[in-house]
């Protein structure tokens, strides 16, 4: 499916160069520096689906993104930031075959909250997570190993993700052992970090055009998101 011009404009933000304090280029996060030996991530187990209300919104945003040409693949990653970091709050869903492929732990930004994420931002240097619909794009090998670039599709909500170098990557501070020791996962500088034992499998599965939907019950975003109100706004799509 052809990606519309709006996506090309968003991706063009790469030309702005690197932003200091970004998730992908930062020194090891403070939580990781403090962590001693941590247990290896538990084997992934395909668990229940996201909560019905979250899944309904995620599917609505995914279908709108497909209709508008932003999403190429029938895969949907759902992150429910309303859940504590100690719960497996990331799902990768095969929409076409109606099945969950992965259900994993995922970290939020260090300034979004402790065990619970409560604050979100689109601003470079905020070290907070962002909400809304993203496109999973290309991969590269960085300081965290295999990493996946995310393109934010929502103006004013997450469309500076590429400038902020918000990527999906693996981290030692995302593990059952770390959570048991600290009562929460470690935190990133805004990136959705995954357990280092499974991140490469997840990234390789969702790369190159699938949807990533990050949820929190923020009233302003829920009311204004173009991808959650597609029927009313589709005629105005770029």
Name these PLM-found stretches.
Residues 26-189, 197-205, 210, 214-238:
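Cell wall/extracellular polymer interaction/catalysis modules
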Residues 1-11:
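Bacterial N-terminal signal peptides that target proteins for export
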């Amino acid at each position: 499916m052809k990606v519309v011009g709006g996506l090309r404009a968003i991706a063009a933000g790469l030309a702005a160069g690197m932003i200091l304090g970004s998730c992908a280029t930062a020194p090891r996060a403070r939580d990781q520096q403090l962590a001693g030996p941590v247990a290896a991530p538990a084997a992934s187990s395909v668990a229940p689906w996201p909560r019905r209300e979250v899944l309904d919104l995620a599917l609505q945003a995914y279908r709108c993104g497909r209709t508008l040409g932003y999403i190429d693949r029938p895969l949907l990653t759902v992150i429910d930031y309303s859940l504590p970091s100690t719960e497996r709050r990331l799902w990768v869903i095969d929409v076409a075959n109606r099945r969950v492929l992965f259900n994993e732990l995922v970290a939020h930004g260090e300034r979004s909250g402790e065990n619970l994420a409560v604050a979100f931002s689109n601003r470079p240097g905020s070290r907070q997570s962002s909400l809304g619909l993203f496109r999973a794009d290309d991969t590269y090998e960085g300081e965290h190993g295999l990493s996946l670039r995310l393109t934010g599709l929502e103006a004013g909500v997450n469309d500076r993700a590429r400038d902020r170098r918000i990527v999906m990557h693996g981290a030692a501070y995302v593990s059952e052992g770390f959570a048991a020791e600290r009562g929460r996962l470690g935190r990133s500088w805004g990136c959705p970090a995954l357990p280092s034992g499974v991140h490469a499998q997840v990234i390789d599965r969702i790369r190159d055009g699938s949807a990533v939907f990050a949820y929190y019950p923020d009233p302003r975003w829920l009311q204004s998101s173009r991808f959650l109100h597609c029927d009313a706004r589709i005629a105005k799509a770029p």
